[in-house]
Amino acid sequence: MRLKKGLMISAIALTGVLALSACTNSAETAPEATVEEDVTFEAGTRMAELNEAGEITIGTKFDQPLFGLVGPDNKPVGFDVEIGKLIAAKLGISADNINWTETVSTNREPFIQSGEVDLVIATYTINDKRKEVVSFAGPYYEAGQDILVLEGNPENIEGPEDLEGVNVCSVSGSTSEANLAEYGAVVLPAAGYSDCLEPLRSGQVSAISTDNVILAGLADQNEGFEVVNNPFTEEPYGIGLALEDDEFRSWINDVLTESYEDGDWEAAWEGTAGKVLDLPEPPAVDNYARP
């Protein structure tokens, strides 16, 4: 993780109070990706196996507004979900044949390693430690860790330097939790970020800290909170997959790059997170060599 004080990311700019249902209602998400017909892949590749199976299992968050949140129809919606649909469509797999599995910060690597999921697209920060056990395509978005406080910011928390000795809620096993320790915060671990809201309301903690896009979704959905808007890390979101499958990773990177150029990535954003956040520049994918 690269700590960078003062980093500003355009995607954090909120555009007013919008109903979260407007951006998570499945009827108002991005247009469905066009499923490739008669697509063929080299025999023995993971792409060929998935295409032949006609289905794919993708792990994503079920409780994160804007990126991955289960809707009234019990299906996840959000930007991560749309990225998953784009990849599936290029494999010749329709959205109806995606098996969505809930992943949280503590089980993403185990789910990939065990084969329980084919991919993880779940606000999943790429870092060197994780690269030791799983591989990453992307990044497809870059966030930054920020801070959520009560509306009006009664404790005048302006940045991470103000968190020393302060009770802060974050998710157990996340990069956000580790970053907070570097600033001397007293971390109250939670299973999910929605579980942090009541401790903040009640005064058990003074702040919640994680990626700005996650906090923006929470603030948009729940009254009485605001984002400090002072991101202090770089969080490149990647698509997790099996460690040694370089061919699949390279293919996904090509799909992402194509989506930047043909407008599919932008449509996925505007139909989900773009209901609340400004359109960012897509990051260049990183075709890194495995250690």
Indicate residue ranges for each PLM-predicted region.
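Bacterial lipoprotein signal-peptidase II cleavage site
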Residues: 20-32
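Extracytoplasmic small-molecule ligand-binding "clamshell" domains
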Residues: 33-119
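Ligand-binding clefts/hinges and TM-proximal coupling segments of bilobed small-molecule sensing domains
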Residues: 41, 175-188, 227-231, 255-291
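Bilobed "Venus flytrap"/periplasmic-binding protein-like clamshell domains
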Residues: 65, 76-91, 125, 143-197, ...
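Acidic, polar ligand-binding/catalytic clefts
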Residues: 98-162
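Short helix-initiation/N-cap motifs at beta->coil->alpha
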Residues: 98-110, 155, 172-173, 188-198, ...
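A ligand-binding cleft/hinge motif common to bilobed small-molecule-binding domains
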Residues: 107, 123-132, 182, 201-202, ...
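Periplasmic-binding protein-like
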Residues: 142-149, 216-255, 277-291
